[in-house]
Curated annotation (Swiss-Prot):
Induction: Repressed by iron. InterPro entries: Plug_dom, Plug_dom_sf, TonB-dep_rcpt-like, TonB-dep_rcpt_b-brl, TonB_box_CS, TonB_rcpt_b-brl_sf, TonB_sidphr_rcpt. NCBIfam families: PRK09840.1, TonB-siderophor. The gene is fiu. One of its GO terms (molecular function) is signaling receptor activity. CDD domains: ligand_gated_channel (cd01347). It is a multi-pass membrane protein. PANTHER family: CATECHOLATE SIDEROPHORE RECEPTOR FIU, FERRICHROME IRON RECEPTOR-RELATED. Residues 180-760 form the TBDR beta-barrel domain. Residues 1-31 form the signal peptide. A motif (TonB C-terminal box) lies at residues 743-760. This is Catecholate siderophore receptor Fiu.
Length: 760
């Protein structure tokens, strides 16, 4: 297994050209820029540069006042064109364009993850997903039908958005009405009974008003998986008043409904590193892998969710250089599911005979019935001005936010065991029934922030920002008394069995100060070097609204604990080459995370744990020629425990679910006016798995390559077709693995998607 921890030499050669290009971009970029220089006697011809559809030049968030090329952070912007060309219908698929980012973790033991369970630079980032700069709560899959672009910011984002994951954030930008009329529609069919349709209508009404309607419907089975299905529908109407004037009002609504059959994964038997959990089950060592099509759930398994979001944004241009914006949003995400997973320890195996085909494993029912709500009002002011010879790009604002979550208690669901090699899903345990043992969390936040980029000279910039958050979190939780197993409590005298009894009722208030500072120097008009330092904090209850009583226990949500703190240093360079159509970036980074909860020798818990993630990242986005577009990147990252208990299965100090090497590249070429071809590849390196005492489960997942391709054909100005092929070489790989290592999600096999796009 030792070899799995390193980047395979035979695969490294595939990256040689790309890595060499980006690691040495400074001299290369200078040479490219020099090609455009002229002598004093030459005739100078100025041509307008057409922006690349693969490299948006500006973040849509007004908190980022500088272009992406002059932002002292590692930032990847995935444009709508990239999403369309790749046929990426959800956020997780779109994020495959960012190296080292993905849904690699399948959950805790019998508790499976759902939705966009994203890991980035060694940390769970699923609680740091935003829509238009506003937190989006819920463990659901987010469709891209109403998305203009996806912005991925690596490193602490506490200064930008408040409490957040220590290693990055993801911001989905919604489509808005625009000052032109047109219709775009698409219809898709593909493998595994994939059917999808979208409609995007924008209509101008008068000189300054426009309406826009986006609609989506999709039904599909999961390729390579029996019984797993997904069905979702969405509608997003919006209207804009005052387009092209100094006063603009935008009204938006989003509704998405999903009815899915969740996937609890399959046993890891037969994977590299697996061994039977006991001598009595040694036959599993040579019984072979299970069929990856196997479904270990029941016919009653489901995952239903409903998202409703209403937004009002008003913008006023005070003058040509100053704009004030006010945004009010209400959003609710309701989700309930019954998901069955398997538990594969020695005590969970039943052996009727010596034939492994008769053996069974225990099933466990994962349940959730939750409602998340957010109400926020945010005011932002942006302005550009001079104080003497120093230029300023200022973004400042205030935010008022209330977030609430109710987890409805449900009665336990008991499930029979399942055959390891021949599972039967024809079981109907019924739906969920609430028992009143609810958990309620609420966080109120008032925040004020200010950012400024100072143009000291033509070539030298300084930037800084600070954000102050005052927060108050309340949490109460009840348990149905008289139960059994972990967390069970005895019923008080006179209280009937199954009655809800309050076990936690507590609150936490505090202030957070997050800040960032950076400097940038332009080596040439097209290239720069920069440094940046940022601090971000996550208070107890900050990621799930749950608090734990002070004084005992290992929960990071204890009210007597301090916020988790992350400090990130970054030094990098960015170059716009080929007439500024292509952006090349490279950066070295280090993130130190402190105040992790660790156990003391006497059995109590304290906050002395420290983690570190460090490495480098290189990226490319834009046009090599007017007909050739690319987006991609490579990262090497080392994530370790610096102080505290090792959490990897192999006993090393490595952080789990973090590939040491990751690469992604997508390229599209317009061969003729009517024919386009595209191809891409991505590599996810070997990852450590977490440890929880499970015996015999794999300590690593193996690295893998996946290739995709696309062929496009334009019939006329109103109609074109595109054929996407995913996992072109039908690679067998582990997409995610759970903490115990009993189960994993196999990667999708080779699939096809044919789409007709209509434009009017």
């Amino acid at each position: 297994m030792e070899n799995n921890r390193n980047f395979p030499a035979r695969q490294f050669h595939s990256l040689t050209f790309f890595a060499g290009l980006c690691i040495g971009i400074t001299p290369v970029a200078q040479a490219l820029a020099a090609e455009g220089q002229t002598n004093a006697d030459d005739t100078l011809v100025v041509e307008a540069s057409t922006p690349s559809l693969y490299a948006p030049q500006q973040s849509a968030d007004p908190k980022f006042s500088r272009p992406v090329a002059d932002t002292t952070r590692t930032m990847t912007v995935i444009s709508e064109q990239v999403i369309k060309d790749q046929g990426a219908t959800n956020l997780t698929d779109a994020l495959k364009n960012v190296p080292g980012v993905g849904a690699f973790f399948a959950g805790e033991n019998g508790n499976s993850t759902t939705g966009d369970a994203i890991y980035m630079r060694g940390a769970d980032t699923s609680n740091s997903i935003y829509i238009d700069g506003i937190r989006d709560i819920g463990s659901v899959s987010r469709d891209t039908f109403n998305t203009e672009q996806v912005e991925v910011i690596k490193g602490p984002s506490g200064t930008d958005y408040g409490r957040s994951a220590p290693t990055g954030s993801i911001n989905m930008i919604s489509k808005q009405p625009r000052n032109d009329s047109g219709i775009d529609a698409s219809a898709s069919i593909g493998s595994a009974w994939f059917r999808r349709g979208t409609l995007d209508v924008n209509q101008v009404i008068g000189d300054t008003t426009a309406v826009r309607l986006n609609v989506m419907g999709e039904k599909t089975h999961d390729a390579g998986r029996d019984k797993v299905k997904n069905e979702r529908y969405g509608v997003a109407p919006s209207v804009a008043f005052g387009l092209g004037t100094a006063n603009r009002l935008y009204l938006n609504y989003l509704h998405v409904t999903q009815h899915n059959t969740p996937d609890g994964g399959i046993p890891t038997i037969g994977l590299p590193g697996y061994s039977a959990p006991s001598a009595g089950t040694a036959a599993l060592n040579h019984s072979g892998k299970v069929d990856t099509h196997n479904f270990y759930g029941t016919d009653s398994d489901y995952d239903d969710s409903t998202t409703d979001t209403a937004t009002m944004r008003f913008e006023h241009d005070i003058n040509d250089n100053t704009t004030i914006r006010n945004t009010t949003r209400w959003s609710r995400v309701k989700q309930d599911y019954l998901m069955t997973a398997i538990m594969g320890g020695a005590s969970n195996i039943t052996q009727p005979t010596s034939d492994v085909n008769s053996w069974t494993w225990s099933r466990t029912a994962n349940t959730k019935d939750v409602s998340n709500k957010i109400l926020t009002n945010q005011t932002n002011l942006t302005s550009t001005f001079y104080t003497g010879s120093i230029g300023h790009d200022v973004s400042t604002g205030v935010e008022f936010t209330r977030e609430t979550q109710t987890n409805y208690g449900v009665n336990p669901v008991t499930l029979p065991a399942v055959n390891i090699y021949h599972p039967d899903s024809s079981i109907h345990p019924g739906g969920l029934t609430r028992n009143g043992a609810n958990a309620n969390g609420q966080t109120d936040t008032f925040a004020i922030y200010a950012f400024d980029t100072l143009q000291i000279t033509r070539d030298f910039e300084l930037n800084g920002g600070i954000r102050l958050d005052n927060y108050h979190t309340e949490y109460d939780s009840a348990t149905a008394c008289g139960g059994s197993g972990r967390g069970a409590i005895t019923c008080p005298t006179g209280v009937a069995k199954g009655s809800p009894v309050t076990t936690v009722d507590t609150a936490k208030s505090g202030n957070l100060m997050n800040w960032k500072a950076g400097a940038l120097y332009h080596l040439t008009e097209n290239g720069n070097v920069y440094i940046n330092y940022a601090v971000s904090q996550q208070p107890p209850g900050g990621n799930n609204f749950a608090l734990a009583q002070s004084g005992s226990g290992n929960s990071a949500n204890r009210t007597d604990f301090k916020p988790q703190k992350a400090n990130t240093s970054e030094i990098g360079t960015k170059w716009q080459v080929l007439d500024k159509r292509l952006l090349l970036t490279a950066a070295l980074f280090r993130t130190d995370i402190e105040n992790e909860v660790e156990q003391n020798d006497d059995g109590t818990y304290s906050q002395y744990g420290k983690k570190r993630v460090e490495g480098y990242e290189i990226s490319v986005a834009g046009n090599i020629t007017p007909a050739w577009q690319v987006i991609g990147g490579y990262t090497q990252q080392k994530a370790t425990i610096k102080n505290g208990k090792d959490v990897a299965q192999d006993g090393s100090s490595s952080l789990p679910y973090t590939p040491e090497h990751a690469f992604t590249l997508w390229s599209q070429y317009q061969a003729t006016d009517d024919i386009s071809v595209g191809a891409g590849a991505r590599y996810i390196g070997s990852m450590h798995k977490g440890s929880d005492g499970a015996v015999g489960t794999p300590a690593f997942t193996e690295g893998y390559w996946v290739a995709d391709a696309k062929l496009g054909y334009r019939v006329n100005r109103n109609l074109d077709f595109q054929l996407n092929v995913y996992n072109l070489f039908d690679t067998d790989y582990v997409a995610s693995i759970n903490k115990s290592g009993y189960r994993y999600h196999p990667g999708e096999p080779r699939t096809f998607l044919l789409t007709a796009n209509m434009h009017f």
